[in-house]
Amino acid sequence: MIDLTSEVHITRLYNAINSARNGMRPFRENRTSMLREYVGRNYNGNGSDHEVIVNLIAQTADVYTIGLASTNPKVTITTDNKELISFADRFRVGINNQIKEMRFSETLQHIVLDSLFGLGISKTHLAATEPIQLEDDIWADIGTIYVSRISIDDFVMDLSAKEVRRCKFMADEYRVSWEDCKNHENFDKQILQKMSPTSKNDRTESQANDISAGYITDDDEYEPMVDLIDIWLPELKAIATFPKHMQSKPLAVLPWDGAEGGCYDLLSFSDVPDNVLPSSPMSNLKAL
């Protein structure tokens, strides 16, 4: 089992993350190539290098996205206990309202679209909130649920596993305000003292976002930013947050008490035996 206080184990973890990131590069490059076909030739000058008369990729993406994620899902909560029927109905309304408030249908549409080009990835977040009064004498601390879409450009997973459920790690990389990072109450202050803002130029490969953003630059960021990485470790049932560009002990370790599979959920259409990364429907249409 990995020990997050051991420098040897942390070095191995960073090496495994870097190896997996390099191993996923061809998949990201193929996805970017398919996205160029998806947007066509007239998208910011960075789309397809040839005229696309009948865009089968775009048409297929529209049909699947509308068909699979056109609206918010709804939950139904029932009980055999007559005394809890009223509570169950209130709970149902509360959850459905929460799903609507966090615009889950929009997130789901993006995840479905991602899956058509390779892999759709969602990340579940849970933040504590003040207790909510349901009845005169009943309070519930349900927390604030949030689901975000993770781009495969920012995602890393254990490629040595033959099944997703056997992956020893999954991770997502993201940029946050350096000011917010420094002032985060749960981050290790000793590690923060060794950190500094980082540049987007620190990454070594292009991303799909560059199709619209153009050249990689920090001029579009009005404040200093820093790159972090959240790593889901099934053995520890925890999420560890590390600096991306500086090997160190974790800034924070958050125990996970949610679903058994962890905070990430993956959606794919064309799984490949003995491989955790799938093929994609769009790869079969690209040649057409």
Predicted regions and their residues:
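Extended, helix-rich architectural segments
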Residues: 1-263, 271
